[in-house]
C-alpha cells in the first residue's frame, strides 16, 4: 500500500463529504488495504471516517476484492446486467484487470490509482471527461475534479505529520502473530506437512508419487492452444468466484460444502481436484 496515494484518497473523500457528494446507489464500494498500518495512519489523520461515509469501509487486508471476494451485487443491478447483457465496469487499484475477476457479471475492469478509484466511484460512470464534465452536483453547484484533488503541498504536509517510522515498527512487530481464533488452531508439530484426507483446500497431488530423477528430452512438442487477443491467465485457470453450476462447484457440493462456503478458485489453489475442474471454465 502506497501511503501517499492513500492519504490523497482520504483527502478527496473528506472534500467530497464536505461538499455534499455521495457515491451513487448503483456503485459498489470496498477498501482492502495491503497492511493493517494503513488503517492506523488513516485513523490518525482523521480520514478513514470520510472514506466510510462514501462506502469505502475496510473489508479486509490483502487480496480480497481483487481476487473475486467482492460479494454479491445489488439484485436489481444483477438482473439488469443479465437481462440487457450489459458490459459493466469495475475500477480498482489492484494489479489485475482480468475479465470477470472482480465479479462474474463484470466484464470490463480498469486499473487506476486509489484517488482515481474514489473519483470514478463518485461520478458513477467510466465514460467521463474529467477536464470538462462535473463529477457530481451538490446543492445546485457542479463539482469538478479540480474541486476535490488535493495539492502536492497539502499531501506533503499531511504525510510528514502522520507517517512516522514508529507506526510501521509497531504494526510489524508481531507480524506472525494472529488473532485469538488463529492462535487457537491446534496443529501437530512435524518436519513435513500433515496431509488431511478430508481437506477441500489443501490436497496432496498425485503427480510426484512416481517421481523419477531421470531426465528425458522432449521431441515434437505442440502448443495446446493458439489464442487471439484479450485472453488472460484467468481464462485458462480462473481465480475468482466458483459457480454452483460449474464442475468445481459440483465437486464441492458433493462433499457437503455449501454454496456460500465455496470461496474462490484462488483460495483453493492447493486442491488440484478443484483447479483441474476450473480449467477453461471462465
Walk through the language-model features, giving the residues of each.
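Non-catalytic terminal/interface segments that mediate subunit docking, oligomerization
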Residues: 1-42, 46, 181-282
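Mobile "lid/hinge" segments at catalytic clefts and subdomain interfaces of large enzymes
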Residues: 2-28, 57-175, 179
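Generic short alpha-helical hydrophobic face used as a protein-protein interaction/packing hotspot
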Residues: 55, 121-122, 256, 279
Amino acid at each position: 500500500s502506497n501511503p501517499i496515494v492513500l492519504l490523497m484518497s482520504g483527502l478527496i473523500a473528506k472534500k467530497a463529504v464536505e461538499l455534499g457528494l455521495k457515491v451513487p446507489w448503483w456503485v459498489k464500494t470496498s477498501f482492502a488495504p495491503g497492511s493493517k498500518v494503513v488503517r492506523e495512519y488513516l485513523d490518525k489523520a482523521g480520514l478513514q471516517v470520510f472514506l466510510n461515509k462514501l462506502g469505502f469501509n475496510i473489508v479486509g487486508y490483502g487480496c480480497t476484492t481483487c481476487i473475486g471476494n467482492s460479494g454479491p451485487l445489488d439484485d436489481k443491478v444483477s438482473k439488469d446486467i443479465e437481462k440487457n447483457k450489459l458490459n459493466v465496469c469495475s475500477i480498482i487499484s489492484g494489479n489485475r484487470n482480468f475479465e470477470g475477476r472482480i465479479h462474474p457479471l463484470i466484464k470490463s475492469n480498469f486499473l487506476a490509482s486509489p484517488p482515481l478509484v474514489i473519483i470514478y466511484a463518485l461520478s458513477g460512470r467510466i465514460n467521463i471527461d474529467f477536464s470538462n464534465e462535473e463529477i457530481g452536483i451538490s446543492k445546485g453547484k457542479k463539482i469538478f475534479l479540480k474541486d476535490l484533488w488535493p495539492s502536492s503541498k497539502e499531501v506533503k504536509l499531511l504525510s510528514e505529520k502522520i507517517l512516522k517510522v514508529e507506526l510501521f515498527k509497531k504494526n510489524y512487530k508481531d507480524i506472525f502473530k494472529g488473532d485469538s481464533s488463529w492462535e487457537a488452531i491446534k496443529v501437530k508439530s512435524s518436519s513435513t506437512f500433515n496431509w488431511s484426507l478430508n481437506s477441500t483446500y489443501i490436497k496432496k497431488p498425485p503427480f510426484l508419487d512416481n517421481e523419477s530423477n531421470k531426465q528425458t528430452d522432449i521431441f515434437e512438442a505442440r502448443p495446446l492452444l493458439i489464442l487471439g487477443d484479450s485472453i488472460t491467465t484467468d481464462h485458462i485457470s480462473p481465480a475468482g468466484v466458483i459457480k454452483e453450476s460449474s464442475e468445481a462447484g459440483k465437486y464441492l457440493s458433493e462433499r457437503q460444502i455449501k454454496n456460500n462456503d465455496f470461496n474462490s478458485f484462488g483460495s483453493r489453489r492447493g486442491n488440484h481436484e478443484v483447479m483441474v475442474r476450473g480449467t477453461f471454465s471462465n
